Amino acid sequence: MNVNFFVTCIGDALKSRMARDSVLLLEKLGCRVNFPEKQGCCGQPAINSGYIKEAIPGMKNLIAALEDNDDPIISPAGSCTYAVKSYPTYLADEPEWASRAAKVAARMQDLTSFIVNKLGVVDVGASLQGRAVYHPSCSLARKLGVKDEPLTLLKNVRGLELLTFAEQDTCCGFGGTFSVKMAEISGEMVKEKVAHLMEVRPEYLIGADVSCLLNISGRLQREGQKVKVMHIAEVLMSR
């Protein structure tokens, strides 16, 4: 199957291993991965800050970059996936662009959802020894409704003991620009998140949204906690 890969800004600038492992995983599962070279930021930071009008040129650029074919567009970040899926609403005053946005949005899929629901794969042959917790990001679980797919894949990782912890579904406090605008509240939220997950003494924290992982990882480091933080793509490529 041919697919397009939407790398995301964080994947491009900060977490290249996550992006690399996402592509390698797709290729391992038989996909031919195309990288639209003109893709850019989805505009989420501006959108979350209320600068919808200012974000529209970037939205149009991304739409145009992803129109070269009709193949699925795979994203390793729920927040970015949701942002693109919301484009038709933001472009409602421009019918032609709204229509183009809707076609692109319909092709956007989260990495784990694509693997489980489209490829029909629940065991990718991964192996990782240790105790782990999974953080379900708000964008992935609440906005996109992708809840079971990441857990299904993780439960089939050999050697991995998947633990649950108190208030597991609670927001980590990142929320894009929320962590900047409401820094004190955000700080308390991630502090509480870390307190709960550390009660079960995991060796790994796994997530499917890099922004959340960066936020929680920062708190873990400040507390001196020896927990390795991994994107689910990195876990699924572990052997």
UniProtKB/Swiss-Prot annotation:
One cellular component (GO) term of this entry: cytosol
Any GO molecular function: L-lactate dehydrogenase activity
InterPro entries linked to this entry: Cys_rich_dom
Xref: Pfam families: CCG
Domain of life: Bacteria
Other remarks on this protein: The E.coli ykgEFG operon is a clear homolog of the B.subtilis lutABC operon, however it is not able of restoring L-lactate utilization to the B.subtilis mutant for lutABC operon. Thus, ykgEFG operon may contribute to lactate catabolism in E.coli, but under conditions other than those tested, or alternatively, the ykgEFG operon may be responsible for the catabolism of a metabolite other than (but perhaps related to) lactate in E.coli.
Homology family: Belongs to the LutA/YkgE family.
Name this polypeptide is given: Uncharacterized protein YkgE
